[in-house]
Amino acid sequence: MQALDVLLNRVSVPRLIEPAPTQAQREVLFGAAMRAPDHGHLQPWRFLTVEGAAREQMGELLAEAAKLQDAEVTEAAIDKARNGPLRAPLVVVVIARVQDHVKYPKSEQLLAAGCAAHGILLAAYAQGIGAVWRTGDLAYSPHVAKGLGLAEGEEVIAFLYLGTPLKEPRVAEKVDLAQFVCAWPGKA
């Protein structure tokens, strides 16, 4: 698959089934992530892979976080949190490892980690792997951070769900670029 085809046609694939990406495919996914633009070459990211029974444990962690976040949370919302990680055979947790740095601010490091996540999504599409970015507010819970073993200065920025597409992915819609791009006229 050509690079421009991947860049112009990647879409989210929300319905995923087994099998999960193979080890060889994962090496490509994470290799692509490592090519993310990174001012200062800090590599301010790391990844956790969650699969098999660990997905159920992650679901319990998210359900606990939902209860802690809102004392009046509904059972439906708790169940949704609990079942979230079961929606794909592989969940990749993308973690930003932000460092105090005089030259490279936190915002740039978070953007670099986001680019690493995007690299995984692009590499997934290029290999025919279904993928979708499904993070949600529970990802930012201190309870989830602790349960996932995050260190100080680390934060979850993405839950990427990966697997085999249940059906043929939709075709990317054309975008009116004029709605997003314009020339700056400079000062008058």
Predicted ranges, named:
Residues 33, 92, 98-147:
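Small-aliphatic-rich amphipathic alpha-helix that forms the alpha element of a beta-alpha
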Residues 67, 86-99:
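Acidic-glycine-rich active-site phosphate/pyrophosphate-binding loop
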Residues 144-157:
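Short, electropositive alpha-helical surface patch
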Residues 3-12, 156-188:
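C-terminal helix-cap and adjacent tail motif
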Residues 1-87, 186-188:
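N-terminal amphipathic, basic helical "cap/leader" segment at the start of enzyme domains
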